[in-house]
A protein has these predicted regions:
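Binuclear metal-dependent hydrolase catalytic cores
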Residues: 1-189, 195, 199, 269-320
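Cap/insert and terminal regions of metallo-dependent hydrolase folds
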Residues: 184-187, 195-291
Length: 321
């Protein structure tokens, strides 16, 4: 089994899908990101990007066991799930975790999205095995030799465990989960649908400290956010960040790489290319996410050859992961 962790972006657009000539380079599908940790597949959100991802998982016979994490339950992060091919495969096992909604449980929201009034096939009629569970900020999600489960701490886990920590951000209407995925010393932070604060979001900076890759909401150009871009109303308070806000978090948290994410649906490829240039001037290792973008991370530590006890490795992992 490879010790590399791979990220692939299948949907990078916010709010609603935007097909067309103006979005060919970066793509128009709404959020969905695949993380491959060895032979384990973790999916972040189920916007329309999960539709081509599902077809690829089925084609490559990688749909046996999957972990799907919802950041929150707004439509652009759930709308692709009814069309997710592995959910219809009897031999597929889906672990679906995320926050409860403001007024409904996670499971009820997913069921409502596929009620008879809105979709011809119910959640129950999808043939896969599904474990649907709401999680809390204080918990961790673990995927190790024993399988996928929710735990109260990450103490005592093996080196092979994928550990996913949760940070709840209140900088988006209804709140949103930010996830930190760690495996073999490599860390990815997924911070979509969050809005920056004056002086940066210090809680998020602490949570994202030393992440190898920070995927951060950057829906707006600064002039759009402040109502200074012709044809675009001000968006302060909408729960999304500017390029500058994303770069401030990346710099303050000492992230290795910043990936701009959740692009505004009205932005053309040319606008996003300009946004990427702006980001690079503020945080050099920045890239604007596009469909098909792949990032590969190599293990930060060689546990097999390290002259440390299991307890010492656990401490080192906690300090550096």
């Amino acid at each position: 089994m490879s010790n590399e962790m791979k990220i692939r972006f299948w949907g990078v657009r916010g709010s609603y899908p935007t097909p067309g000539a103006g979005t060919v380079k970066y793509g128009g599908n709404t959020p969905s990101v695949e993380v491959q940790a060895g032979n384990r597949t973790i999916i972040l959100d189920a916007g329309t990007g999960i539709i081509p991802l599902g077809r690829e998982l089925a084609r490559t016979k990688r749909a046996g066991e999957l972990l799907l994490l919802f950041s929150h339950l707004h439509h652009d992060h759930t709308q692709g799930f009814p069309f997710f091919v592995p959910a219809y495969m009897p031999n597929a096992k889906l672990h679906i975790y995320g926050p409860d909604g403001t007024h409904e449980s996670l499971k009820n929201v997913l069921e409502h999205n596929q009620s008879s009034e809105t979709f011809p096939i119910s959640l129950r009629d999808m043939s896969s095995s599904k474990e649907i569970q709401a999680v809390r900020e204080s918990q961790v999600i673990v995927w190790d030799e024993a399988g996928v489960r929710v735990a109260e701490s990450a103490v005592g886990l093996s080196d092979e465990a994928v550990v996913i920590r949760i940070h709840k951000s209140y900088a988006h209407p209804g709140g949103v989960f930010v996830y930190r995925i760690t495996w073999h010393g490599q860390s990815i932070v997924y911070a979509t649908d969050t809005e920056g604060y004056v002086g940066t979001d210090k809680r998020l900076v602490k949570f994202a400290k030393d992440a190898d890759v920070l995927i951060h909401d950057s829906q707006y150009l600064d002039e759009h956010y402040w109502g200074q871009l012709e044809g675009f109303p001000a968006t302060q308070g909408y729960g999304h960040s500017t390029v500058t806000m994303a770069c401030e978090v990346a710099a303050s948290s000492l992230a290795g790489q910043l990936v701009l994410f959740h692009h505004d649906p009205a932005y053309t490829d040319n606008m996003l290319a300009g946004m990427e240039r702006t980001a690079k001037s503020l945080f050099a290792d920045s890239v604007a996410a596009h469909e098909g973008l792949e990032i590969t991370l190599s293990p930060r530590f060689d546990y097999a050859n390290a002259p440390l006890s299991a307890k010492e490795r656990e401490v080192q992992y906690a300090q550096n992961g």
